[in-house]
Amino acid sequence: MRADFSVLLVDDSKTQLAHGRSLLQQLGFSRIQLASNGRNALRLMAAGGAPDVLVTDLEMPDIDGVELLRVVAEQRLASAVVIVSSHESAILTSVDDMARQRGLRVLGVVQKPLALTDLRTVLERFESPTDIAEESSPMLALSAADIRRGVASREFILHYQPKVTTTGGVLKGVEALVRWQHPQYGLLSPASFIPLAEESGAIDELTDYLLDLALTQLQAWHAHGLAIAAAVNLSAKSLPRLDLADQIAAATAAVRVEPRFLVLEITETALMADLALSLETLARLRLKGFSLSIDDFGTGFSSLQQLSRVPATEVKIDRSLVHGAAANPTMQALLKNIIDMVKKLQMKSLGEGPDNEADWRLLRDLGCDMAQGYYIARPMPADNLVEWLKHGTKHLRLASGLTGRH
């Protein structure tokens, strides 16, 4: 992993600070700063600039970790944060959600005492393609005209992250994740331009273009014998379009890809915000044979009754409920309830964000159908997928107790 970025470690315990610094040094980091509480951390950041990664405890005197995160978010004092605590999972989940809602790039939540493997896992996300996808760049001077020009110039590209079965790691599909190769700003994440596209009305043009990209790639894979599905994110702003289902069906037919190989994803929160408005389009898409996936499930407080009204084929459980769940009995109980509920509705379940073997095994043992996360593979260009299939799934088969070729 890269170890050339700066880290600020905040903890009121001298022992924990020394331990954390030792772990960071073992990982190859040299640009390390230490602070004994939130106020000292803010002074350091004011004097020396924002660190690349802030690693902070929560319970501290004077300014605690929660207040520190709020100030860091308001003043944009860190590129990314790691939350560390020995508190129960409910508190950690709330703080994690609060930080993300404030626009912070949360690499992960780690239980104390810090372990080398856990710290390595979260810090690796700072450089990963998936983490790039979560980055927000609110200061960029972008406009709807820029997005339309980018579409016309084919500056938007797709990377693909594998979705595999938890029993053997068999590839079933990929999620198409958009990036913008901007001529001035470089590679931009969706957070940098999707909100603007939605607000300005440019989202439909962008969505149509990305669907064409994904379908063209599916056609190429299928022609070479790789019969997998591809998932494309659908904005809630697009759902009221009366012609959406017909247009997607026409685009699929044009490249001779069967509708069942295209999965359309929409987040739980966006879906439930105006379920009545969405249901007509979703029903028509299902009637035409397309698969529907509810993304980020577990963050929007949907009830079983609400979920049963959606003609979805798949539920993607949010990574905040999956990451670290193997060491968290409360999260395990939540996961089990969601997976069991999804089974009762005769949908497929997919766990997002397993970053280690323990979380991967937990998803398998709880009966989750599929998984998608760093432990499996990071998002990759389309050309890399076949090579990954040859060499990248061995650890999944071993973790599943399988040894032969599958």
Regions found by a protein language model. Give the residues of each.
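Active-site beta3 strand of CheY-like receiver
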Residues: 49-55, 82, 312
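Alpha4 helix (beta4-alpha4-beta5 surface) of REC/receiver domains from two-component response regulators
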Residues: 67-70, 74, 87-108
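Helix N-cap/capping motif at the beta->alpha junctions
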Residues: 12, 34-43, 65
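EAL-family c-di-GMP phosphodiesterase catalytic domain
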Residues: 87, 109-120, 236-238, 265-273, ...
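Active-site residues of response regulator receiver
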Residues: 11, 57, 318
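Two-component/phosphorelay signaling modules centered on CheY-like receiver
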Residues: 5, 14-33
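C-di-GMP signaling machinery
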Residues: 125-157, 197-201, 242-245, 279, ...
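Bacterial c-di-GMP phosphodiesterase EAL domain
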Residues: 139-256, 270
